[in-house]
């Protein structure tokens, strides 16, 4: 992709934008949509990216006359207050600048279409520019395919005339744009900033773990192409956007549940020396707060010689997989995005505990997804977001799948979470076999009943049964304590 610029771009900038452009289906689609409206739109996209990515982007004083409209648009973009503030997040950031380019380009294209609709003179000039651009391309193609020297001079004259007419048309477009509504343009740019930040936030919610602030770190582990692809699906797939919002909420709850669980599992079994603030004895804190003993405390603290509680957590060996059996019968459709956000939160716990995670979707049939050590690829997230089985409810099939997952693991102490809003029949022989394997492999089953009262069947195979209105009910959050 070759582009001309009105900014102080260099060969690295142009090469890097070409790489980003080739990774982004959204930018490619936007390029195809924008070029028929404004012939220099592909060049404009490159400049929008450079203005977001470069440390010190500047608009050049002297530019080709055919880029006059681009210069006017870039002046409008870069003068906007929301744009300047946004650059704090996009400078030298490949992902943010790529997402920002798509959003700013989209809003600019929409704004141009609106101005063209309102301004008859602008519409005429842009139509003229489009015709001239098309004629210029045809003339250049004809020149490359015809080696007749006698006609070469005529073609060059015709090309020069077309280029001159194109310059005049683009200059007129720039003048008309200068008189167009700047308030609507500023509003469009502010929307682009907001939408870009929201998309990146949703991306971190999906990819992040349950550790506070882990979203950015987890994001960096994914190749840029994968980051861009998932971000673009979030911005175009409403279901994935909702799933990301629920995942972010549930991961925060899971973080608190896991922290509380860890604190409860730690015994203060004596006194030792060290410098961990949260474990210091009250006496040491008193010495820190008293002027006469503060210096001595700080010296001993720096040397790791302050007295603190000795804590011994329960020793944790390898644990079996975490298995989520998730009802996807037709009645669960309304809670689908909640359910998948819930699944992503459990998956992040498995990742933290370095446990395999299996998601068994069930209705009349089952579909099993396995994620070793709780790790999931961006494309797998999209597949999961788009999957919904529908149909009736059968319990034996997902439970049979859960047994397979548990029995294949070399570790005991698996956790099975069974979620349903329905009821099903289980024959006695299956229940006996399931419970026998459960005892042998040492795993537990927690069942969540959503909006139903019937618990007789799930009690046959569950260690604990909880009733909840939906996944956002506090009773459902008990699952995050596993």
Model-based region annotation:
Residues 1-64:
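Charged, amphipathic alpha-helical stretches
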Residues 43, 51-110:
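N-terminal targeting peptides and non-cytosolic leader segments immediately upstream
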Residues 389, 422-470, 480:
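VWA/integrin I-like adhesion module and closely mimicked acidic/polar interface patches used
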Residues 102, 109-319, 465, 473-481:
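Acidic/polar low-complexity segments with low predicted structural confidence
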Residues 315-373, 379-419, 424-426, 447-456:
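Von Willebrand factor
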Residues 353-355, 412, 441-445:
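Loop/turn elements at helix/coil->beta-strand transitions in domains of secreted/extracellular proteins
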Residues 371-389, 465-473:
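Acidic, Ser/Thr-rich peripheral helices and adjacent loops at domain boundaries
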């Amino acid at each position: 992709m070759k582009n001309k610029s009105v900014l102080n771009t260099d060969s690295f900038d142009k090469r890097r934008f070409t790489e980003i452009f080739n990774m982004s289906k959204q930018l490619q689609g936007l390029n195809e949509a924008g070029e028929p409206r404004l012939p220099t739109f592909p060049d404009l996209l490159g400049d929008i990216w450079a203005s977001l990515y470069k440390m010190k982007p500047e608009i050049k004083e002297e530019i080709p006359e055919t880029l006059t409209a681009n210069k006017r648009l870039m002046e409008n973009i870069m003068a906007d207050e929301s744009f300047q503030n946004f650059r704090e997040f996009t400078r030298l950031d490949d992902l943010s600048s790529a997402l920002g380019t798509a959003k700013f380009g989209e809003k600019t294209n929409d704004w141009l279409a609106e101005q063209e609709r309102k301004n008859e003179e602008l519409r005429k000039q842009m139509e003229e520019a489009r015709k001239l651009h098309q004629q210029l391309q045809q003339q250049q193609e004809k020149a490359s395919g015809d080696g007749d020297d006698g006609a070469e001079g005529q073609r060059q004259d015709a090309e020069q005339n077309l280029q001159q007419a194109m310059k005049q048309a683009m200059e007129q477009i720039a003048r008309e744009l200068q008189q167009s509504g700047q308030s609507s343009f500023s509003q469009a740019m502010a929307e682009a900033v907001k939408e870009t930040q929201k998309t990146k936030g949703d991306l971190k919610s999906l990819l992040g773990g349950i550790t506070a602030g882990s979203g950015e770190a987890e994001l960096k582990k994914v190749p840029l192409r994968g980051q861009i692809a998932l971000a673009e699906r979030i911005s175009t797939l409403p279901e994935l956007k909702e799933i990301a919002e629920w995942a972010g909420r549930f991961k925060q709850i899971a973080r608190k549940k896991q922290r509380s669980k860890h604190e409860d599992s730690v015994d203060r079994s004596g006194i030792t020396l060290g410098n961990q603030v949260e474990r210091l004895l009250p006496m040491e804190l008193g010495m820190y707060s008293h002027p006469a003993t503060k210096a001595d405390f700080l010296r001993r603290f720096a040397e790791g010689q302050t007295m603190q509680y000795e804590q011994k957590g329960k020793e944790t060996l390898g644990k079996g997989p975490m298995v989520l059996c998730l009802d996807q019968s037709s009645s669960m459709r309304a809670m689908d995005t909640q359910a998948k956000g819930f699944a992503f939160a459990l998956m992040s716990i498995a990742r933290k505990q370095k446990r395999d995670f299996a998601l068994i979707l069930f209705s009349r049939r089952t579909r099993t997804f396995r994620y070793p050590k709780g790790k999931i690829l961006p494309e797998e997230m999209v597949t999961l977001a788009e999957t919904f089985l529908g149909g009736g409810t059968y319990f034996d099939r997902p439970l049979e799948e859960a047994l397979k997952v548990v029995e294949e693991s070399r570790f005991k102490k698996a956790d099975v979470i069974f979620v349903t809003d329905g009821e099903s029949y289980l024959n006695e022989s299956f229940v006996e076999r399931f419970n026998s394997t459960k005892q042998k492999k040492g795993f537990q089953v927690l069942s969540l009943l959503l909006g139903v009262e019937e618990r007789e069947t799930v009690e046959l195979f569950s260690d604990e049964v909880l009733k909840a209105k939906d996944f956002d009910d506090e009773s459902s959050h008990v699952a995050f304590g596993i």
